[in-house]
Amino acid sequence: MAKKQNFIHGAAILTVGVIIMKLLGFIYKIPLGNILGDEGYSMFTSAYSIYFIFFTLATAGLPVALSRLIAEADANGRAKQEEKTFRVALATFAVIGVIFALILFLFPEWLAAKYLENPDAALSIKAMAPSILLVCLVSAYRGYCQGNGNMIPTTVDEVLEVLFKVISGLILASCLLKAGFGKPVGSAGAILGVSIGSVI
């Protein structure tokens, strides 16, 4: 009965968190579009589509699998196995994150021209490199927390990540454009907000 209540409580917390994140993401698009203009916003959305692909490849199913392994070890009282599983998962996530971050950082021009047909988005793609590494590492910790049945740290972390992404992205984009930098740099500044949000 207690486990069922904990599950319902955790699901409710996660649902509220998802709603808040969706609202923040929706609100974010309006001022960002006004700041960057059509040209800059096109670079941002193009680069973000590449980020989403790499994010999906880097984390697809892995946090869920980790949470199940952690939950099983925790239920059976195998603390050492739980710790070992987390260490292996963290190392795996780190390797995946480094590989994908290097691809984004070293080949942004090729990705922008080949897949986006928008060469001006190259700088924004490069700016995403730190974010994909940080997201991979954070995903391991989220899977660990979920496996232990504690949804509060995961939900709070995700909401704060989106909040700081919104704030830092808007500030960076606005400041860079006001300083006289072009739209590609302004778009890259908005993208850096994703990395800042991941650090938080």
Locations of regions flagged by a protein language model:
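Short membrane-interface helical motifs at transmembrane helix boundaries
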Residues: 99-119, 177-178
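N-terminal membrane topogenesis motif
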Residues: 1-24, 80, 84, 151
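Alpha-helical transmembrane segments of multi-pass membrane proteins
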Residues: 117-141
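Interfacial/gating helices of multi-pass transporter permease domains
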Residues: 32-53, 120, 183-192
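Hydrophobic alpha-helical transmembrane segments
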Residues: 157-171, 180-200
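Membrane-interface junctions at transmembrane-helix termini in multi-pass inner-membrane proteins
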Residues: 135-157
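Small-residue-rich midsections of specific transmembrane alpha-helices
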Residues: 45-70, 130-133
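Transmembrane-helix boundary and interhelical linker motifs in polytopic inner-membrane proteins
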Residues: 37, 59-91, 147-152
